[in-house]
């Protein structure tokens, strides 16, 4: 299917939560099925393409910049106090605060990469507030998955990984992501900038298979500082926080996971394990010739979202007024 035409938000705002202000937007049909888009990274922030995956006549499309990212305040690279709060529990609380603020009873979740992981964390914490899940390029914060993404996959990109590793000298036994977290917290802005450059260069290398282009925002010093700081903090901090053991709580929810066979940063074994633990209501769709994202995967997500809406399993349920 073709994506829907571009649309603009009909409402935006800032939501005050403990320690942060979150930028949010709504678009589509104010009386439609509530749907929440969760961006990746962590720290990638919102663009606008996510709106085109939802029928604007069917869905009330909600999105927000997660704490520390995008237009939310303060930025993670500018506030150690904010950064210290960036964990799954707080991310989930932020989502729940937004749901209450917008008067949504329950919503469809669509998350990409880290956003897909966050969608599962929210769903297992608040299963009665979720209508279904569509995840793309799921990556988790399990220590084993983070170590693969930051070290193991270096066997496939030895040149890029050597540059990443050599830019962060560390004692034996120190995880690379821990070394980068320390560099990105340095009081020296030159040290922080070099570390951010090295990190985003590695990000572009390990997601390059399958024709996925680099993120042009990495050319922006502010963006790469925020992105690298959040990624390294979350990846170093959360460890086994991904709720793999809690998936039985959401086995009743219709779920589609779309993943690229060529995704070497988060191999297809990750969503395969999730789908097996989830049960028969979780469908894994593998796109054979794409990696950590791509147009076919985006199209598959749009189709999955439309299919869930057409099953009549998703009904708009509002606890308050439809606007903003």
Can you name each region flagged by the protein language model?
Residues 276-293:
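Catalytic histidine neighborhood in serine/cysteine hydrolases
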Residues 290-302:
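Catalytic histidine-centered segment of alpha/beta-hydrolase-like enzymes
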Residues 105-147:
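Conserved hydrolase catalytic core segment
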Residues 264-270:
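Conserved alpha/beta-hydrolase "acid-adjacent" motif
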Residues 89-107:
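Conserved acidic catalytic loop of the alpha/beta-hydrolase fold
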Residues 257-259:
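Short beta-strand/loop motif that positions the catalytic acidic residue
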Residues 148, 152-246:
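Alpha/beta-hydrolase
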Residues 20-76, 81:
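Conserved HGGG/HGGXW glycine-rich cap/lid loop of the alpha/beta-hydrolase fold
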């Amino acid at each position: 299917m073709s994506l829907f035409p571009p649309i603009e938000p009909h409402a935006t705002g800032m939501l005050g939560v403990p320690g942060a202000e979150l930028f949010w937007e709504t678009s589509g049909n104010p009386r439609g099925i509530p749907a929440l888009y969760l961006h990746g990274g962590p720290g990638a922030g919102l663009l606008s393409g996510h709106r085109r995956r939802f029928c604007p006549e069917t869905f009330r499309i909600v999105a927000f910049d997660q704490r520390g990212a995008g237009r939310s305040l303060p930025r993670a690279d500018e506030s150690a106090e904010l950064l210290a709060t960036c964990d799954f529990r707080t991310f989930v609380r932020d989502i729940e605060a937004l749901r209450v603020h917008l008067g949504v009873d329950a919503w469809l979740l669509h998350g990409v990469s880290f956003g897909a992981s966050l969608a599962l964390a929210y769903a297992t914490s608040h299963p009665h507030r979720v209508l279904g899940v569509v995840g793309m390029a799921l990556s988790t914060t399990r220590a084993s998955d983070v170590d693969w993404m930051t070290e193991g996959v270096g066997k496939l990109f030895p040149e890029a990984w050597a540059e990443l590793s050599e830019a962060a000298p560390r004692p034996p036994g120190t995880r690379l992501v821990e070394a980068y977290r320390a560099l990105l917290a340095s009081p020296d802005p030159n040290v922080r900038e070099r570390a951010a450059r090295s990190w985003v260069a590695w990000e572009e290398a390990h997601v390059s298979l399958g024709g996925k282009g680099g993120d042009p925002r990495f050319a922006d010093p502010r963006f790469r500082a925020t992105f690298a700081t959040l990624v390294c903090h979350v990846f170093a901090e959360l460890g086994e926080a991904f709720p793999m053991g809690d998936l039985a709580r959401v086995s009743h929810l219709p779920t589609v996971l779309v993943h690229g066979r060529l995704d070497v940063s988060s191999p297809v074994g990750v969503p395969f394990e999730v789908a097996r633990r989830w049960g028969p209501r979780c469908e894994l769709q593998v796109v054979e010739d794409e990696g950590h994202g791509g147009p076919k995967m985006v199209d598959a997500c749009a189709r999955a979202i439309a299919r869930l809406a057409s099953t009549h399993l998703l009904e708009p349920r509002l606890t308050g007024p439809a606007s903003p």
